[in-house]
Curated annotation (Swiss-Prot):
It is found in: Cytoplasm; Nucleus. This is Importin subunit alpha-5. The modification Phosphoserine is found at residue 63. Gene3D superfamilies: Importin-alpha, importin-beta-binding domain, Leucine-rich Repeat Variant. One of its GO terms (cellular component) is dendrite. Residues 1-41 are annotated as: Disordered. Low levels in all tissues examined. Keywords: Acetylation, Cytoplasm, Nucleus, Phosphoprotein, Protein transport, Repeat, Transport, Ubl conjugation. It holds the Pfam family Arm. A motif (Nuclear localization signal) lies at residues 42-51. Heterodimer; with KPNB1. Interacts with NSMF; the interaction occurs in a calcium-independent manner after synaptic NMDA receptor stimulation and is required for nuclear import of NSMF but is competed by CABP1. Interacts with APEX1 (via its N-terminus). Interacts with CTNNBL1 (via its N-terminal). Interacts with AICDA (via its NLS). Interacts with ANP32E. Interacts with ZIC3. Interacts with SNAI1 (via zinc fingers). Interacts with DCAF8. Interacts with ITSN1 isoform 2. Interacts with TALDO1 isoform 1.
Length: 538
């Protein structure tokens, strides 16, 4: 394990101390956070319950109130599916049959329309409160179910629409309905609460503060139908989700035990949402990471990296990646689960986002101790990383650059030489021309670490010649470093100046020679001329 003393010694050997261990591994506020912020098509935070034609037909046949159903269906509807006065009259009538029939009509409007008239429903005075009142009708489970369905679909709308459901007092009643003896009612209550929690961090915290977790977790202890389990784990993931601020960990950590066995359910939807929940819970300081590790989920998460559905692989990879942002011991737990072979496989994924997050995960492993860097070498991962550094999309190249530079920062002389022999210098030099200042710094730091090793070798063998200077010149790196002396970022131009002065000597600069800019590639263009044996004379 890396000791604080070793880390401090490593830092003191830098001229530029900006790349500290926190920057090397715990890149949560930058690349790591950016990875989490991206919109995921695989997971919806809100879901509308839409009946299929088959379900509708079955319902018509099984309905006891056939006359009332026909009465509703024959109502004169205004253009655009507006709510009729008959519907509101029936909602507020004292007849349970009329109440049910009208509620079903509202439900159909909110379920079938491509653009459901949610605003029209909530703007009809007293209607939302009436549906909440119907939730309390324990003697009429069908009315409870239909009302819950209506409110679920209202809560599937925008934040203002969701707030109407909350302000009508629905949340505590929905939580009570999680313990209903009728599974249809339970499931619809879960769905509604999932929609409300998925709206915003404020709604999520309100639902948590209403003490949803005990009855929700109790649902998992029963033999449920699959749709119930799917809805419940989805609601659970929404309760764990959110960064600004995250949920109070003490309120969501009790779900870890349930999540640990949900990882062994065969259904991909259940697996995906369980993995997302674990990725949210592991996204934070080391004590949260430790709680996730202590739940015993790491080995199964690593196994799921090889799942055949990206819907499962993406959140499993996110969770594994979050865990290795922890300390060396926490990172080792993942390594002990044989994660590297799975990660190597993901580096060749046709899905760019998977490839990128695999690189990000590996970059946090190479920020560990030398033994951990060696496991990455032994797994033969660096050839793939260097290939990615040369050919992948820029967002993926960035993560590969971090993985390689982190290895040069903490690696031994032999480990750094291995990276040079694999050909890491040329792609690092190529990154010096990109527009992203942070990645230019990462590439400069990697090259500096290599040059420092060369200087030590030159002193040790008495030759006085740094073997890596020539390799950087051959890769047109010297041109690029010299150009960076005029970079607008102070840290970059200072680092470039220091590298030239310390490793390449001072040479006259022709300020009239400036590279062109290729905006499509987000980088500068340098003429690729042959380097003379004595180096460049600019």
């Amino acid at each position: 394990m890396s000791t604080p003393g070793k880390e401090n010694f490593r830092l003191k050997s830098y001229k530029n101390k900006s790349l500290n261990p926190d920057e090397m591994r715990r890149r949560r506020e930058e690349e790591g956070l950016q990875l989490r912020k991206q919109k995921r098509e695989e997971q919806l935070f809100k879901r509308r319950n839409v009946a299929t034609a088959e379900e509708e037909t079955e319902e018509e046949v099984m309905s006891d109130g056939g006359f009332h159903e026909a009465q509703i269906n024959n109502m004169e509807m205004a253009p655009g599916g507006v709510i009729t006065s008959d519907m509101t009259d029936m909602i507020f009538s004292n007849s349970p049959e009329q109440q049910l029939s009208a509620t079903q009509k509202f439900r159909k409007l909110l379920s079938k329309e491509p653009n459901p008239p949610i605003d029209e429903v909530i703007n009809t005075p007293g209607v939302v409160a009436r549906f909440v009142e119907f939730l309390k009708r324990k003697e009429n489970c069908t009315l409870q179910f239909e009302s819950a369905w209506v409110l679920t679909n209202i809560a599937s709308g925008n934040s203002l629409q969701t707030r109407n459901v909350i302000q009508a007092g629905a949340v505590p009643i929905f939580i009570e309905l999680l313990s209903s003896e009728f599974e249809d009612v339970q499931e619809q209550a879960v769905w509604a609460l999932g929609n409300i929690a998925g709206d915003s961090t404020m709604c999520r915290d309100y639902v948590l503060n209403c003490n949803i977790l005990p009855p929700l977790l109790q649902l998992f202890s029963k033999q449920n139908r699959l749709t119930m389990t799917r809805n419940a784990v989805w609601a659970l993931s929404n309760l764990c989700r959110g960064k600004s601020p995250p949920p109070e960990f003490a309120k969501v950590s009790p779900c870890l035990n349930v999540l640990s066995w949900l990882l062994f359910v065969s259904d991909t939807d259940v697996l995906a949402d369980a993995c997302w929940a674990l990725s949210y819970l592991s996204d934070g300081p080391n004590d949260k990471i430790q709680a996730v590790i202590d739940a015993g989920v790491c080995r199964r998460l690593v196994e799921l990296l090889m799942h055949n559905d990206y819907k499962v692989v993406s959140p499993a990879l996110r969770a594994v990646g979050n865990i290795v942002t922890g300390d060396d011991i926490q990172t080792q737990v993942i390594l002990n689960c044989s994660a590297l072979q799975s990660l190597l496989h993901l580096l060749s994924s046709p899905k760019e986002s998977i490839k990128k997050e695999a690189c990000w995960t590996i970059s946090n492993i190479t920020a560990g101790n030398r033994a951990q860097i060696q496991t990455v070498i032994d797994a033969n991962m660096f050839p793939a990383l260097i290939s990615i550094l040369q050919t992948a999309e820029f967002r993926t190249r960035k993560e590969a650059a971090w993985a390689i530079t982190n290895a040069t920062s903490g690696g031994s002389a032999e480990q750094i030489k291995y990276l040079v022999e694999l050909g890491c210098i040329k792609p690092l030099c190529d990154l010096l021309t990109v527009m992203d200042a942070k990645i230019v710094q990462v590439a400069l730091n990697g090259l500096e670490n290599i040059l420092r090793l060369g200087e030590q070798e030159a002193k040790r063998n008495g030759s006085g010649i740094n073997p890596y200077c020539a390799l950087i010149e051959e890769a047109y790196g010297l041109d690029k470093i010299e150009f960076l002396q005029s970079h607008e970022n102070q840290e970059i131009y200072q680092k470039a100046f220091d590298l030239i002065e310390h490793y390449f000597g001072t040479e006259d600069e022709d300020s009239s020679i400036a590279p062109q800019v290729d905006l499509s590639q987000q980088q500068y263009i340098f003429q690729q001329c042959e380097a003379p044996m004595e180096g460049f004379q600019l």
